[in-house]
C-alpha cells in the first residue's frame, strides 16, 4: 500500500493535480486559507498517471473490499475514475446525484441497483467527508450494502475522520496529505522550512496561525 501511496503522490504532483503553495495560500469556497489545491480532473488528461491511478483503484478495491459487486460514485467528481476502474474489474457502475432530478424519472441514483447489493463508493478526494457520507446514506436508503469507499486523495483532516467514523463509513485512500508533503519536499516542490506550517494546517485548517502572520 505504501508503494501505491508514493507512486500516486508522485504522479499527482508531476501533473499539477495536487499543487502546494504554502507561501501564497489558496482560498477555498468556505473561506479557509489553504496551502494546497487539489484538482483530480487533471488525471484524465495525463494517460500515464490515469492508468496508474485507475489500476490502483481497482487493486485497492480487490484487496480491501473483495466482496464488492458494483461501483458507485458521486456525480461528476468520481464518475470517470469509477467507470474506468469498474471496466478493469468487470463490475457494473452507477452514480449518485446530490439530489433527485426534477424531470424524467426523477432519479437520484443512476444505474441499476438491487436490494442488498454490495457496493464500493469511488471518490476523487475526501476533506470533511460530507459529500461521501451523503452518497453512502442515499445508497443505504436505496437498499444497498455499502462496504466502504476508495478515494484518490484525502486531506486526512480530523473532522473528516470523525464524521466518517460516526457514519460508519470505512474509507481507504490511494494517497494522502502527509505523503504528498513528504514527496514534495524530497523532490524539491517545496522548501523544507514550509513543512511544519503545512502539517499545522492539516491538523487544524481553521487555525490560520500556520501562515505565520500572512493574510
Give residue spans per PLM region.
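PRPP-associated nucleotide enzymes
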Residues: 1-122, 130-215
Amino acid at each position: 500500500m505504501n508503494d501505491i501511496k508514493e507512486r500516486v503522490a508522485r504522479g499527482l504532483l508531476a501533473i499539477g493535480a495536487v499543487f502546494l503553495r504554502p507561501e501564497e495560500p489558496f482560498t477555498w469556497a468556505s473561506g479557509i486559507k489553504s496551502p494546497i489545491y487539489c484538482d483530480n480532473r487533471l488525471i484524465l488528461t495525463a494517460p500515464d498517471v490515469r492508468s496508474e491511478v485507475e489500476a490502483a483503484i481497482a487493486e485497492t478495491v480487490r484487496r480491501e473490499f473483495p466482496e464488492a459487486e458494483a461501483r458507485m460514485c458521486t456525480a461528476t467528481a468520481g464518475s470517470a475514475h469509477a467507470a474506468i476502474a469498474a471496466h478493469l474489474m468487470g463490475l457494473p457502475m452507477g452514480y449518485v446525484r446530490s439530489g433527485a432530478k426534477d424531470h424524467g424519472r426523477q432519479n437520484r441514483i443512476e444505474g441499476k441497483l438491487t436490494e442488498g447489493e454490495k457496493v464500493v463508493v469511488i471518490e476523487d478526494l475526501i476533506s470533511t467527508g460530507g459529500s461521501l457520507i451523503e452518497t453512502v446514506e442515499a445508497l443505504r436508503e436505496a437498499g444497498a450494502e455499502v462496504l466502504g469507499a476508495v478515494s484518490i486523495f484525502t486531506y486526512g483532516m480530523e473532522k473528516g475522520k470523525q464524521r466518517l467514523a460516526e457514519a460508519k463509513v470505512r474509507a481507504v485512500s490511494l494517497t494522502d496529505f502527509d505523503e504528498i508533503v513528504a514527496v514534495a519536499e524530497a523532490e524539491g516542490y517545496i522548501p523544507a522550512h514550509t513543512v511544519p506550517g503545512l502539517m499545522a494546517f492539516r491538523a487544524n485548517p481553521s487555525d490560520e496561525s500556520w501562515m505565520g502572520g500572512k493574510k
